[in-house]
Amino acid sequence: MLVILAFIIVFHIVSTALLFISTIDNAWWVGDGFSADIWRVCTNSTNCTEINDLSSTEEFSGYSVMQAVQATMILSTILSCISFLIFLLQLFRLKQGERFVLTAIIQLMSCLCVMIGASVYTDRRQDLHHQNSQLYYLLQEGSYGYSFILAWVAFAFTFISGLMYMILRKRK
């Protein structure tokens, strides 16, 4: 039982770490000498433009889309942290034989938020780049970066983690 418990804890910590990295790091769209994410666009290592600074509609078209991605990724990270804390509390407070349902529900909500954020970015990325060509002029020839991929991996991890919590019962 201790091995299963250790595995679940490590799995949850890894999925939360993936959420933090994918939300914070600047590599959702990368290419030769540039990178862009949900927070900023960098044409080289020293020339970065914060998207939040360009929030007026005439400067950055589609800002609400980026805000939606930012909000869902932040919310998924927060929910994953909360579900881990609730899991630790339930570990000591639940009666023997009960399931970790609250932890599972919150972890699955985190999974849903990651899916929404990554899906919105996937769907709207090309439109954002074309509508804001003055900012993304170098970024047309690029590919999805490791932060974007980590967001999808975190989606899978949080989904599996949520299912594990749903199935798991407290034992001695």
Curated annotation (Swiss-Prot):
It is found in: Golgi apparatus membrane; Cell membrane; Apical cell membrane; Membrane raft. GO terms for cellular component: apical part of cell; apical plasma membrane; cell surface; cytoplasm; cytoplasmic vesicle; Golgi apparatus; Golgi membrane; membrane raft. Keywords: Cell membrane, Cytoplasm, Golgi apparatus, Membrane, Nucleus, Transmembrane, Transmembrane helix. Expressed in glomeruli. One of its GO terms (biological process) is protein localization to plasma membrane. The chain crosses the membrane at residues 1-21, 72-92, 100-120, 148-168. Functions as a key regulator of cell membrane composition by regulating protein surface expression. Also, plays a role in regulation of processes including cell migration, cell proliferation, cell contraction and cell adhesion. Regulates transepithelial migration of neutrophils into the alveolar lumen, potentially via mediation of cell surface expression of adhesion markers and lipid raft formation. Negatively regulates caveolae formation by reducing CAV1 expression and CAV1 amount by increasing lysosomal degradation. This is Epithelial membrane protein 2.
